């Protein structure tokens, strides 16, 4: 894993127009003294999002799900993305794990291009009863009145980043 991370940072050093990169993932599940391994995000093993503008990259990324939350990302971009998760009073704009993953996917692409590189990068344990099994799906967050405020916070955070990056008004970005 450390050598995979080193490959990502070297790639980002050589490609200043990219904001993030990651390698290949495995998911593992211990069961009765054995461990089962499964490749993750296999359909994105050679994925790149290379649009020249934030809007082009967001359109190119549409329906891609390979979480960039766990990628290597430029420090300044991550700091700005993280700061956008909070309201001026310090409260969180959204709390849902899947919404946070979607936010980081979109936000990372606002700051630059993305690449999946051919290096082993991470192994994640699939834990029965973990947040991935108990968190409200994004499809519900987007459509349920109960989560309207949280979804609006998500949209506002992305709109602010997009407006700042493209020099648009908040209304144009929203």
Task: Kindly label every feature range from the protein language model.
Residues 132-174:
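Terminal low-complexity segments of carbohydrate-biosynthetic enzymes
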Residues 1-143:
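Nucleotide-sugar donor-binding/catalytic module of glycosyltransferases
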């Amino acid at each position: 894993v450390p050598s995979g991370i080193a490959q990502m940072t070297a790639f980002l050093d050589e490609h200043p127009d990219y904001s993030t990169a990651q390698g290949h993932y495995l998911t593992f599940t211990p069961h009765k003294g054995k461990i089962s391994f499964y490749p993750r995000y296999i359909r994105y093993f050679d994925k790149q999002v290379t649009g020249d503008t934030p809007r082009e990259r967001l359109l190119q990324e549409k329906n891609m799900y390979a979480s960039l939350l766990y990628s290597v990302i430029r420090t300044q971009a991550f700091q700005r993305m993280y700061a956008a998760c909070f309201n001026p009073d310090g409260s969180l704009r959204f709390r849902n794990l899947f919404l946070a993953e979607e936010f980081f996917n979109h936000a990372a692409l606002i700051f630059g291009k993305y690449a999946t590189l051919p290096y082993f990068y991470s192994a994640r344990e699939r834990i029965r009863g973990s947040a991935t099994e108990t968190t409200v799906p994004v499809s519900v967050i987007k459509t349920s009145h109960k989560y309207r405020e949280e979804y609006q916070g998500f949209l506002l955070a992305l709109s602010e980043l997009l407006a700042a990056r493209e020099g648009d008004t908040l209304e144009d970005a929203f």
